[in-house]
A protein has these predicted regions:
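C-terminal cap of metal-dependent C-N hydrolases
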Residues: 19, 73-114
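His/Asp/Glu-enriched, well-ordered alpha-helical/loop segment
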Residues: 3, 9-80
């Protein structure tokens, strides 16, 4: 795996409330992205720094956005021990559709600095 990214395109609930073939594709991933990364690290599939590179600098290289990424990069403070339940209330994204609803995840971005 060279790079890991999401295609964050928030969809309202109404965009998903039709027969499957008629809905817009996609699931909510923005809110669970860090927790799933923490899980990959805890399962020893990635070292922490390796995962950070795969979700930050390497996607910027692939998209030919390295200079912009360096200029506009911020910091994210992650609590890898924070346990939380995925629910419509804890998902901040407009879209609330995820197969992870009701599951307890470990790890969450708790602060961003730009």
């Amino acid at each position: 795996i060279d790079a890991i990214c999401t295609h964050h395109e928030p969809l309202s609930s109404s965009a998903k409330m039709a027969p499957f073939a008629e809905t817009q594709p996609g699931i909510t991933a923005f809110d669970t992205y860090v927790a799933l990364g923490v899980q990959l690290i805890q399962e020893s599939l990635f070292e922490p720094l390796e995962w950070v590179e795969k979700v930050t600098s390497i996607p910027a290289q692939v998209a030919n956005m390295t200079e912009r990424w360096k200029q506009e990069a911020g910091w994210v403070l992650v609590d890898p021990e924070l346990e939380w339940v995925v629910s419509k209330e804890t998902i901040l994204s407009q879209g609330k559709n995820t197969p992870l609803l009701g599951q307890t995840l470990k790890g969450k971005a708790v602060q961003t600095f730009i």
